[in-house]
């Protein structure tokens, strides 16, 4: 479903068979309940303040430039996350990937938020996982731990 650039403030109930949702550049403050088979969400450039529970099949979630202060639990299937330019103060635990091939790269972009705390498991993630935390007020203890991980 592609409903970009429509100035939508609400969405109707979504079809159960929906796998791809692109609602970039609207005026949404919330998303409806998400279908269980959904694999891709792009809801950048809206006014979202919260997200519903994420489906276990979700692989890509992009919600840049919204007003999110909290993220729900992230599904293990997630391969790409972009929550840049929101109001997040923390991140949920990053899913441990034990069922994907070693070639699968995981990319989480969390720039320009208010993140001061990160989940402990970020410090022990697989090298195929990239997490970008630029422009966040991370504590000096966390910055030191992260720099030791990349050294």
Feature names for model-found ranges:
Residues 11-14, 31-34, 51-54, 71-74, ...:
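Canonical leucine-rich repeat
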Residues 4, 9, 13, 19-20, ...:
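Intrinsic-disorder/low-complexity detector
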Residues 1-3, 21-23, 41-43, 61-63, ...:
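Conserved hydrophobic beta-strand positions in leucine-rich repeat
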Residues 82-85, 93-151:
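Leucine-rich repeat domain C-terminal region
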Residues 14-19, 27, 34-39, 47, ...:
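Leucine-rich repeat
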């Amino acid at each position: 479903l592609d409903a970009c650039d429509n100035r939508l403030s609400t969405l109707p109930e979504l079809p159960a068979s929906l796998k791809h949702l692109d609602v970039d550049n609207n005026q949404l403050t919330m998303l409806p309940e998400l279908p269980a088979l959904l694999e891709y969400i792009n809801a950048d450039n809206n006014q979202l303040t919260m997200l519903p529970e994420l489906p276990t099949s979700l692989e890509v979630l992009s919600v840049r430039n919204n007003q999110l202060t909290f993220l729900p639990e992230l599904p293990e299937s997630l391969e790409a996350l972009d929550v840049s330019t929101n109001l997040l103060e923390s991140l949920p635990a990053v899913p441990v990937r034990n069922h994907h091939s070693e070639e699968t790269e995981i990319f989480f972009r969390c720039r320009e938020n208010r993140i001061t705390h990160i989940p402990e498991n970020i410090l022990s993630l697989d090298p195929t996982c990239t997490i970008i935390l630029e422009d966040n007020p991370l504590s000096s203890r966390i910055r030191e731990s992260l720099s030791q991980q990349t050294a």
